[in-house]
Amino acid sequence: MPKAEAGASVTGLSESAYVAPDFLHTFPFDSSKIIFPKGEQKVQIEPECALIFQATWEGTKLTGLKPLCFGASNDCSIRKEGAKKISQKKNWGAASKGLSENLIPVDGFEEGCVLDDYRIASFLVRDGKVYVYGEDSAVRNYSYIYGQLIDWMLEKFNGQKDEGPAEDIHSYL
């Protein structure tokens, strides 16, 4: 799998073409560590199944997402006082999120595919003791999965408005 490089840019776009806040320009995933934000005390573990997609575009519209692989992820959040947007709670810099070093190829993205055989379970190690954290969940039982998940993602990427905690994601793409 290709890795994102620090300072990577999109071919043909000048730095001034980016409309996303500067803190979103930093690739947040790391497979070996999470660097906690300075001065923040309320970091929340969020175990997830991360999916890597190949995107299809028609002009500026995202029209398709093809799953390529998946792996365990820690989608950490900060319970940040005064944060108005989800991104302010979710992205605080390099190594702010965990992603498995070993990603598993997807053989399809519908009931009966390899994802049906996987579960997400999370454990916290503190003072040498292991604690169960959260629910042991079958990936196939996620509330949004397969076609429903892709449809929802395409709708959000293309049409979500900058309202309340949500942002106009399409303008960032």
Go through the PLM ranges and name each one.
Residues 172-173:
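Conserved catalytic-core subdomain
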Residues 1-169:
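Glycine-enriched loop-and-adjacent helix/strand subsegments that border the catalytic/binding cleft
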